[in-house]
Amino acid sequence: MSDIAKLLGDEADKLLKHECRGIPKARLHLPGPDFVDRVVASSDRKPAVLRNLAALFNHGRLAGSGYLSLLPVDQGVEHSAGASFAPNPDFFDPGHIVRLAIEGGCNGVASTLGVLGAVSRKYAHKIPFVVKFNHNEFLSYPNTYDQTLFADVEQAFEMGACAVGATVYFGSAESRRQIWEVSQMFKRAHELGMATILWCYLRNNAFKQGDTDYHVSADMSGQANHLGVTIEA
């Protein structure tokens, strides 16, 4: 802790000793060993979904803590794989990505249909898979903040995935279509017994006004998270 305080410098006391007085801690649904039972079990999710959630929460170094550490890799789709992996070309191999998650003690590995599908028979029983079924891509010009379906839920189910994942760019011109698409995919995933994970991003150039970037405001990012939970992420 003393090393952390040194790194934080003059901001150490403000950051390490801050206590929120607006909403008491006791009113928050905080992570814990009983998170699935305490928070999720009373929802309308099927027992198979709860089982797969428990598989995620009880795997890796953080098993039983209520926290998740996922290795997310979408390089090659939303980022140039060459720019990302050139310093370590081994990671062009999907097997190396999954092994990194295993050796790092992650709760699971989240990646594309292609990456996880290429090695599913070898690794799906060794670490929970999260198949991300929509992506942006930046070969199209001008670039747009949109998410396109790259896979369907049945493909993730057949390869043995515990969960599916998606992104919605809340606030973008395409966000309402994205919300509908992801909502329908999550519904199908729950029917098949898989958990659902959503990356809730704010994307709108109008959210930047002068030197202020409202993308990072607690109220707007909290609204994005609330919309994500509304479609049962």
Go through each PLM region and give its residues.
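N-terminal amphipathic alpha-helix/helix-capping segment at the start of soluble metabolic enzymes
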Residues: 1-79, 84, 117-126
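Alpha/beta enzyme core
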Residues: 23-30, 63, 75-233
